[in-house]
């Protein structure tokens, strides 16, 4: 049986879920719990030159800062940090003295591998254990990976890692890379494995490494509760239990469960991580998981839409996340549809100079149904937004969301005003999607704001808003119909509320805007 060590990366990889803001006391509690659990190697966070130090955040600029959360008695545990190539200058490292971290993990993309190994050499020369992290290992050809291994042999670091950055590595892929490394890597160098869980394979892949007949020393990364970017990581608590049961492990599970219960659960509620369909799609397309997160946060796309956007991506853009790139790709995709405006003149005649009531699907549209019913008269034009309001037969339905359009009964299509991103026949009007966008990213194509802009252009005199409640962190509070509720990150919801408020204020300077029903999280 090969010797296995566990490296817990909760304080570093988990930081993608909370912007590394664990809180100073929680940082110390997590470290203490990991030591109690007998975890072999503890990663404390990022080391970088590009930030300012904040003790509540696990992004550090010096080893003195991270030493504040490392116990004086390390109890035989190894403490490390990770630096992304180019974000820290090894010249700033003091000589190793055992007080702070014992090693540094250097993560790099294939294009930077030669220069990154030079940085690793400088770090090793200062006495630290060096962990070589070849990100997106599957992006290498066998020849390229062998060349990297030969260069690593010359360096002779502490460990060389196989890295499944996008959670797409299947057992046959892992086995192939492992034997390639095992047969060619200097025997003095340990073999590491870092995985993500986009395809729910992190646990089974780790087990397969445990079960391999090899004399090599292994280091396998995990995080408590699987806390990590996108689909998360291998769960520390599950993996060490497996080692206890199958590989003579000597880990205490209880401190790990306490970390989950007392600290991580709260972060999970605010910004969940774990397996999801978008994260599966990113892995299937060998793309950075943040792309999936961006598209999922839109809540406007079907699985087919996301697949088509991934298919549009340039191969060289998939490896590193580029927010501007995916935003432009999303907008280009959404703007590809046709427009059909033969009834536009008729609509303008019906809207110009009139009072408009826009009914969005917020909970107040149901709770204050009597107020809505009593407000409506023959001089008010009623439009429901992104759904068919069940309590009033509205004059029109405005839709910009393909998901919502598909849920609509076909008999209602003749009164639908849809944006051009929705492929639709037999609708009243199909208007240009791109012309209704606003300037704030979080709500750039929010249906309610698009409707306000559209009917303002049509000449509405006053626009009253019903069901424009904004977004609660409790998804059950957001919609009058429970089937419309969706779960998303609280940071996204907060940004949407801020963006809606800002745009409502802007539009109120162009047209008279008033709330008819109680709003909770937005205002004019």
Describe the function of each predicted region.
Residues 1-341:
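Catalytic cores and adjacent flexible loops of soluble metabolic enzymes
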Residues 339-524:
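Metal-ion/cofactor- or nucleotide/acyl-coenzyme-handling active-site neighborhoods
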């Amino acid at each position: 049986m090969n010797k296995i060590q566990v490296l817990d990366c909760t304080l570093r990889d988990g930081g993608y879920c909370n912007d590394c803001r664990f809180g100073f006391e929680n940082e110390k509690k997590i470290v203490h719990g990991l030591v109690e659990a007998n975890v072999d190697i503890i990663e404390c966070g990022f080391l970088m030159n590009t930030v300012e130090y904040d003790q509540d955040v696990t992004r550090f600029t010096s080893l003195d800062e991270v030493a504040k959360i490392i116990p004086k008695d390390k109890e035989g545990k190894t403490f490390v940090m990770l630096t992304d190539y180019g974000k820290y200058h090894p010249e700033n490292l003091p000589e190793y003295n055992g007080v702070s971290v014992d090693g540094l993990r250097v993560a790099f993309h294939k294009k930077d591998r030669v220069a990154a190994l030079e940085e690793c050499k400088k770090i090793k020369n200062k006495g630290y254990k060096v962990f070589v992290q070849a990100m997106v290992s599957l992006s290498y050809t066998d020849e390229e990976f062998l060349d990297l291994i030969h260069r690593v042999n010359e360096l002779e670091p502490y460990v060389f890692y196989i890295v499944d950055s996008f959670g797409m590595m299947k057992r046959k892929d892992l086995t192939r890379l492992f034997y390639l490394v095992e047969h060619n890597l200097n025997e003095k160098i340990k073999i590491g494995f870092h995985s993500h869980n986009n395809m729910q394979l992190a646990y089974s892949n780790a087990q397969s490494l445990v079960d391999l007949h090899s004399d090599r020393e292994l280091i396998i990364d995990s995080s408590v509760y699987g806390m990590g970017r996108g689909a998360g990581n291998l769960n520390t608590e599950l993996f060490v239990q497996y080692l206890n049961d199958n590989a003579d492990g000597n880990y205490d599970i209880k401190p790990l469960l306490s970390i989950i219960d007392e600290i991580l659960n709260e972060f999970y509620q605010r910004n969940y991580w774990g397996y999801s369909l978008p994260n599966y799609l990113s892995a299937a397309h060998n793309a950075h998981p943040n792309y999936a997160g961006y598209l999922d946060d839109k809540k406007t796309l079907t699985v087919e839409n996301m697949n088509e956007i991934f298919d549009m991506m340039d191969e060289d853009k998939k490896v590193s996340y580029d927010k501007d790139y995916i935003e432009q790709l999303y907008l280009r995709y959404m703007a590809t549809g046709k427009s059909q405006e033969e009834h536009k003149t008729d609509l303008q005649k019906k809207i110009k100079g009139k009072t408009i009531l826009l009914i969005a699907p917020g909970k107040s549209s149901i709770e204050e149904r009597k107020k809505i019913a009593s407000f409506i008269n023959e001089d008010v034009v009623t439009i429901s937004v992104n759904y068919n309001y069940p309590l009033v037969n509205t004059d029109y339905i405005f839709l910009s969301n393909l998901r919502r359009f598909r849920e609509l009964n076909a008999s209602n299509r003749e009164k639908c005003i849809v944006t051009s991103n929705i492929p639709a026949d037999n609708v009243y009007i199909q208007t240009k999607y791109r012309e209704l966008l606003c300037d704030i990213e979080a709500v750039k194509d929010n249906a309610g704001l698009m409707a306000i802009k559209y009917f303002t252009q049509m000449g509405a005199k006053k626009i009253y808003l019903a069901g424009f409640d904004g977004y609660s962190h409790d998804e059950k509070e957001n919609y009058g119909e429970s089937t419309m509720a969706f779960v998303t990150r609280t940071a996204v919801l907060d940004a949407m509320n801020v963006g809606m408020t800002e745009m409502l204020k802007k539009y109120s300077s162009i047209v008279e805007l008033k709330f008819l029903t109680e709003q909770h999280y937005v205002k004019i």
